[in-house]
């Protein structure tokens, strides 16, 4: 099972040759609008960019306004909440952080 939750006005960009394990969630939104006292929406969708050849581990969650460079690995159960534009990273944890650099992976 994989979930791509994209809102009106949002965008999820998934590069070529990515590999997603089961129960991966990628969201460009918060599921529900949050409004201020004037009734204006304060939590607009923000795009998610995932580069080419990215391996996303089981039960990883990638949230709005996140970016992952090419040739990266996202560890199982990780929660990505920010931008990691550099290539060849191993990213893991909650919240996700860089745990190794200069890596790559093969199927």
What annotation goes with each model-predicted range?
Residues 89, 96-97:
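A short acidic/histidine/glycine-rich donor-binding loop in glycosyltransferase catalytic cores
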Residues 69-72, 86-87:
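Conserved catalytic segment of ABC-fold P-loop ATPases
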Residues 55, 73, 90-92:
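Short-chain dehydrogenase/reductase
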Residues 77, 87-88:
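Tight coil/turn sites that cap or link beta-strands
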Residues 1-67, 94-95, 101-103:
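Flexible, glycine/small-residue-enriched loop-and-beta-strand segment within the central core
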